[in-house]
Amino acid sequence: MDRRTRENPERTFDLVLKVKCHASENEDPEVLWKFPEDFGDQEVLQSVPKFCFPFDVERVSQNQVGQHFTFVLTDMESKQRFGFCRLTSGGRICLCILSYLPWFEVYYKLLNTLADYLAKELEEDLNETLKSLYNHPVPKANTPVNLSVHSCFITPDITGLPTIPESRNLTEYFVAVDVNNMLRLYASMLHERRIIITSSKLSTLTACLHGSAALLYPMYWQHIYIPVLPPHLLDYCCAPMPYLIGIHSSLIERVKNKSLEDVVVLNVDTNTLESPFNDLSSLPSDVVSALKNKLKKQSTATGDGVARAFLRAQAALFGSYRDALRYKPGEPITFCEESFVKHRSSVMKQFLETAVNLQLFKQFIDGRLAKLNAGRGFSDIFEEEITSGGFCGGSPRSYQQWVYTVKKGGALFNTAVTKATPAVRTAYKFAKSHARLGLKEVKSRLKHKDNEEEYGTCSGLVQYTPVYTLHNEKGENREKHKLSQTHLKRPHKSLDGTLYDDDDDDDDIERASKISSEDGEETRAYFYESDDSVEAQVKAPYSGEMDLLGEILDTLSTHSSDQGKLAPAKSLDFFRSMDDIDYKPTNKSNAPSENNLALLCASGDQGEWNLGQDDSALHGRQLPPSPRKRVSSGGLTESLFILKEESREKPLCADSVSGPTVVGKPAPTSGLRSQPAAPEASQTERGRAEVKQTPGQAPLQSEDLSVPGPGSRQSTFVPWEKAGKEDTKPSKDVGLLQEVVSLCHMSCDFQQDLNISEESRSGNQT
């Protein structure tokens, strides 16, 4: 019961009454009209009319008491139901709206509209307006609501701090009572005294009670709370328990005639406060002086300055409650009163020793603990004020630790995970790892879909969705690990394309895995990584690691660009349709040299460099639209080792692979095309120069490593095609590995010396 208002009321209001007061106080008020007409709670119908005239009706007129005021009824659940009233006809007629919503300004405005309808006898408009609001779902904060042409409002935000002049209650309270009496009343409320506030204006009286009680936030007055006391309940002032009661000045003489002991009385009309206690001196002097100086500033008079000044005082007094929160494995989070009090100064310690026994503080702590242990958590302006003001005596990270515990499912759930049996823990890790894989797959699909929308899709091509997985470096051998670490401390690429570092990620996990314990030490929370996730990652066809071979080719392309003018990486034929592509071989000499390299690169004949689609179009094979596949660093390293070992073990014959040669009259079906991989082709061939050993595929032999002649086009090895097709047409089944071998040889030549002379070319031909 940390708050007294109902969180989710069913309706905007429950009842509207028109009550008539008789001339004699001995006669009960009479209900003239009600809405809805079928309202059947007789107890409410009998009690509400008596609260509509909380003054001496025989002595006071409407001009003396004002128009608007509010009373409060408490239901069986200790929740407050507000009665918003407006006096008319000289104080003899009262309109009352009963609601669980503390919308003071909204209902005061609605009462004025209803009074106008009654004065003009517009009963149809009156019923239509009430019916529209009664059937309207409870709107959220700051939502405009239109009831009729002349009636509309914006729902207030009751969770925020009250502001001046928007809050009528706080405005009237701040204007009617000076700063010193506000501080004395505040201190008396913190000590839970018996408090009476009196005034001749009902509107000012009820505003002072509601305004003073609101300044206790985030705590709430937990005892008897009657903003305005009707004549038949004056004996409540003799109750031995704490109370906060408002009494009209016409009835205060009757109250003083009763035996009152230890009662604090605030007279708003004379701005005087009578108290047998000196509660203000028991508060820490630094807190009181800071609050007093803040309230006296002119800038505090508007906005939320007054409410925030009291909020800061509350944070200074009670903000260290976070340091007294205790957590033991297997038990809910608890609050240690001894720890809350013992480390304070003498004045603060004396006050807190009294404060821990206050009902408003106990309800506040119980509400916080209930939210923490239920896993809901809390984040309000009070917690923000504690953090910003540094009123928590412990580590600044302590509150984040509790929030982290809540996010992990509450203290009880966290205990269940850490104290679970190995079987339960393994199941938890398995579910967690597969949930991560599923999330990564969804992100990769969304990313691939965005790429398709951005670059378009090629008709007739098979689309694929790469599955990005985390790479397990522990299972690699030492040689692969060295090759993958060619670029030291290479940041990995995340699923959304951003770069991150493993060390930073580990630090974040370590920082997030701290929770506080009873003795103030910090223990680590458990972050489980499933062993099953590693197996799932190995089976993934593609990986999100960097393409090292592609970067090597990029480097070679950059070096070769200095030797001559280069054309764009992709020709315009890349965007041509499949029917427009011509694959007729040319009969010119393609031997690369220093003289004709620039001509080859800048040649207008794009048939030589249209490697983006020619292979798939030539054989009718459907390849992925992306020119560059992503492979894992482990698989790529393995391919490079295979290429190096096979190239060293067995020299390649002239029919297989040779260096660049000069061909005078190239035959259409034999010979070797000696055209090097120019920089234009390196961009498109980069994604194709990758090898993937699929299950069931025969080991590659050096005899199969051949490059196509000038009469045939280089084809890309498709791993999902059956091996039976290789025996039918050898000219069409040249694998991707052939291109890799040729690229490696030619890349070495480019890297050693791009100035290819005539002597080296004749030596290679021999």
Curated annotation (Swiss-Prot):
Annotated consequence of substituting residue 482 to A: Impaired interaction with the AP-2 complex and impaired TCR down-modulation and recycling in TH2 cells
Domain cDENN residue range list: 160-296
Skewed-composition ranges (Polar residues): 694-704
Expression across tissues: Expressed in a subset of dendritic cells (DCs).
Ranges of biased composition (kind: Basic and acidic residues): 722-732
Compositional bias of kind Acidic residues: 499-509
Post-translational modification remark: Phosphorylated on serine and/or threonine, possibly regulating the guanine nucleotide exchange factor (GEF) activity.
Modified residues (Phosphotyrosine): 500
Bias (Basic residues) ranges: 480-492
Region (Disordered): 472-523, 611-634, 652-732
Keywords: Cytoplasm, Cytoplasmic vesicle, Guanine-nucleotide releasing factor, Phosphoprotein, Protein transport, Transport
Record's subunit section: Interacts with RAB35. Interacts with clathrin heavy chain/CLTC. Interacts with components of the adapter protein complex 2 (AP-2) AP2A2 and AP2B1. Interacts with CD3E.
Protein name from the UniProt record: DENN domain-containing protein 1B
Organism taxonomic ancestry: Eukaryota, Metazoa, Chordata, Craniata, Vertebrata
Gene: Dennd1b
